Amino acid sequence: MTIKTLADGTSYTKAHAHDWEDPDCTIKGRVKIYRKIDGIRAIRNKIGDVWSRNSKPLPHCDHLNFQDAEIFRNSWNETSSILGRIDAPTVALTQENVYELRDGFIDPRLYIGWADNPSNENLEALMHKYIAQGDEGLIVRVEHKGKVLWWKIVPYKYADVIITGFKEGTNKNKGKCGSIASNWGSAGSMVEDCLQDHNIKGDANIRTWLWQNRNSLIGKVMQVRYREKTEAGKLRFPSLVRLRTDKNEESFD
């Protein structure tokens, strides 16, 4: 879990992906399990305007009651289409399309149940059950040292893609790699052991190394994991898994 901020300083919680494929990586303690619906995150800033997590205005939501919510109507594509255009939809969004996410105020429609020390196998099975019903996966929330940690349980696909460029990070990542570009989208997050072949550990060190070596890496192949391909053929939420020095061709699951 990470506490992130919008451009005006409004804070919100971002869930971290739980690596349920790793048998050594488990979630401990009593947890509450929720549906992760495949919508668009919408957050009210300090003056009440509705922004995306990238601090971009989201239209057609001002009449809805929420502070930090997932907006969802029928599918991610339909929701994205509504919030991505200036002209109002034929049928306005309603409160039924709003799923509040704040701790203590979470929409009861999202709640599945609780568990003690859930196994990765059980989480995977539950994830696939709800994906079959149209959800994106699960969110597991667990109290830890007075805070509520958010873990997302989502499926992964893998692809080997050619690196086409690098973008410098901002704020704490200034002077480091912010994202790695490919023809299929940009990877802005890095798996913890993505540079284990180079004995580089820690997000800051990984981003520093990538930025320092960016010129020699352009044209090389990186392995990314992602959720799915969009209708435009882009990868949703790609993350760097490792550099593929043994390959020079692209491939997809």
Segments and roles (model prediction):
Residues 3, 110-158:
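Amphipathic alpha-helical
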Residues 25-107, 252:
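Covalent nucleotidyltransferase
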Residues 75-97, 185-253:
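Intrinsically disordered, low-complexity regulatory tails
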Residues 156-172:
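Structural detector for short beta-strands of small beta-barrel domains
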Residues 29, 35, 65-76, 139-142, ...:
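Flexible glycine-rich surface loops and low-complexity tracts that mediate binding to linear polymers
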